[in-house]
Design a protein with these regions (language model features):
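Terminal targeting signals and extreme-terminal segments of soluble enzymes
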Residues: 1-136
Length: 136
């Protein structure tokens, strides 16, 4: 297996997408086991009625984190095939950290597990993504 991509190799890909720029996500950490992405607090992402982050935002960044965990290992586009999210508790105002770990690197499909947590480490959602890792 090739070496894991470095922060310097991943960051331009992550931040070069206009949608990612809108979200404000930042690469927090990259290592051989995982990728961590920070979603800074943005009041636009929270419901006005109860002050919790919208589940669609959580799902979106879970997907992005899983993608980059697999991408960091394969250095090729890995489109999402399937995504499962379990919402554990309401995400209150504040930054969130999304840590994705590769469970399996396959010839056709790879799997990543993702934890979305507040800055105290309390998980607000977990996800599992399946990503197409087929070589073209």
């Amino acid at each position: 297996m090739a070496a894991v991509l470095t922060r310097e190799e991943i960051e331009p890909v992550l931040t070069g997408t206009k949608f990612h720029q809108f979200l404000g996500i930042r690469l927090e950490e990259v290592n051989e086991q995982s990728v961590t992405i920070r979603l800074p607090y943005n009041e636009l992402f929270y419901t006005s009625a109860d002050g919790y982050i919208h589940g669609g935002i959580l799902a979106t960044v879970i997907d992005i984190a899983g993608y980059f965990a697999v991408f960091s290992q394969l250095n090729q586009p890995v489109p999402t095939v399937d995504l499962k999210i379990d919402y554990l508790r309401p995400g209150r105002a504040g930054d969130l950290l999304f840590t994705a770990s590769v469970v399996k690197l396959g010839r056709s499909v790879s799997i990543a597990d993702i934890v979305a947590a507040d800055t105290s480490g309390k998980a607000v959602a977990i996800g599992r993504g399946l990503f197409s890792s087929k070589q073209e």
